[in-house]
């Protein structure tokens, strides 16, 4: 399995250790993989050949089929996603958190929420947010890496085999959380920017770390994950909306679930405005994309050479020569007669 990628190399963990007990190899990949467009990602199961045990090197010759692929961060065969959101420093942004949750839901993987830095917020605020997130349909872990709150409970929840991706905005404490779960990692951390109150990027690449039977991926922070492209699919990525519509479907197939008559989501719901914001962005993006396509077609049409009437086109020189030769042969045969 691929544990990490850097430059043109990948670190691969072996299912069976080598003759010298080596369990990891630093590998390149076959040129054929690159030419065929097969991209190696962290979490991929691969076949390694041309092993040099003394140097600890090998070559990735083939990729095994994936169960799934998380696009950002690019991790394959994911079992669970932990979306980390800080209550303070930086303050929790419901829309930003929703974007991360929608992106995670779109992968088809089990999703949970980790509320970090709970020691910096009043207890009523922590409890209110935990209750709110459960209403959204998520299991919640309230933790503080600095105070050690909730760390053991989170470690216990990671006791099953599989790949767990830890993702979230910059500065929410993902690396600090992993350091608390496994102190020997000593991952680099940094304080939130004092002037902008934004997180600083400390993790530069994705890497898998063992945590009991699980493999946990620390990922670089980013603040604006992309939403799925299809507006019609958005409802599937809001668990509370999905749950309600399964019990009380809408009267209309094309309902936007914004409180219109006949909608299964009668009345306001907690994330209605957040859902509406995401939906509006997707609809605007689609309209903008259609407009760009129409404009491109129009401009291309303006440059296109007009099609002439077939009767006015100049004939093919080859066909003209064939007809001329045929006519000459016919004349010759007529003279012979």
Language model features: what each stretch is:
Residues 78-85, 106-118, 137-142:
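Conserved beta-strand/loop subsegment of P-loop NTPase cores
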Residues 8, 36-45, 50-51, 64-74, ...:
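Helix-rich effector regions associated with P-loop NTPase G domains
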Residues 61, 141, 217:
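General small-molecule cofactor/ligand-binding pocket signal
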Residues 120-172:
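Canonical P-loop GTPase G-domain recognition
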Residues 1-94:
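N-terminal accessory targeting/assembly segments
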Residues 175-176, 180:
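Walker A/P-loop
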Residues 91, 121, 149, 223-225:
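Catalytic P-loop NTPase motifs of RecA-like helicase/translocase cores
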Residues 46, 78, 95-109:
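Switch/coupling subdomain of P-loop NTPase systems
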